[in-house]
């Protein structure tokens, strides 16, 4: 499995700011969007382009345009919504699919509760977004679902990943690509990433 930890100084700076214990909801949201945007820039660097002639200000001009790439952005509810606007900044015409999965805090197992997948998913690249890759259970369940629907091309974008989650994801889906802002130390006894960001969903939505 291709794993890319984006080491750009802006990404490292912003993910560092997100680790503040008393960060405000407003600031956390802003940074989640910004880092999501920067990860998208990296994850789409292999998109093919083609030459297209357009009417410029001084007559015809040949420009590069992305070559017929169909994309669906797939936020995992609810925390994935915090990254969605940053991703869509670069691809405002992308279709959005939604998958609702939460992690049972006792068993740490994923529990699906909602799905709305775009049509023709088999023709699209799916960019699955979620702030945290902890045990990997929710991400694996989401990718299982997308593949059952016919999706054949999947990239995962997360803010912070634990080695345990990366290992589990690679074992289940070695054909996907993972882009993250940081690979952290690991999981604590409660299954939270350390040092991590805390509960990203609560910080994005202002809940506890």
Swiss-Prot record:
InterPro entries: PRibTrfase_dom (IPR000836), PRTase-like (IPR029057), Upp_B (IPR034332), UPRTase/APRTase (IPR050054), Ura_phspho_trans (IPR005765). It is an enzyme of class 2 (transferase). Pathway: Pyrimidine metabolism; UMP biosynthesis via salvage pathway; UMP from uracil: step 1/1. The keyword Cytoplasm does not apply. Uracil binds at residues 193, 198-200. One of its GO terms (biological process) is UMP salvage. It comes from the Bacteria. 5-phospho-alpha-D-ribose 1-diphosphate binds at residues 78, 103, 130-138, 199. Its EC number is 2.4.2.9. Binds 1 Mg(2+) ion per subunit. The magnesium is bound as Mg-PRPP. Keywords: Allosteric enzyme, Glycosyltransferase, GTP-binding, Magnesium, Nucleotide-binding, Transferase. Allosterically activated by GTP. Its cofactor is Mg(2+). It catalyses: UMP + diphosphate = 5-phospho-alpha-D-ribose 1-diphosphate + uracil. One of its GO terms (molecular function) is uracil phosphoribosyltransferase activity. CDD domains: PRTases_typeI. HAMAP family: Upp_B (MF_01218_B). Belongs to the UPRTase family. Catalyzes the conversion of uracil and 5-phospho-alpha-D-ribose 1-diphosphate (PRPP) to UMP and diphosphate. This is Uracil phosphoribosyltransferase. It comes from Aeromonas salmonicida (strain A449). The lineage of its organism: Bacteria, Pseudomonadati, Pseudomonadota, Gammaproteobacteria, Aeromonadales. The gene is upp.
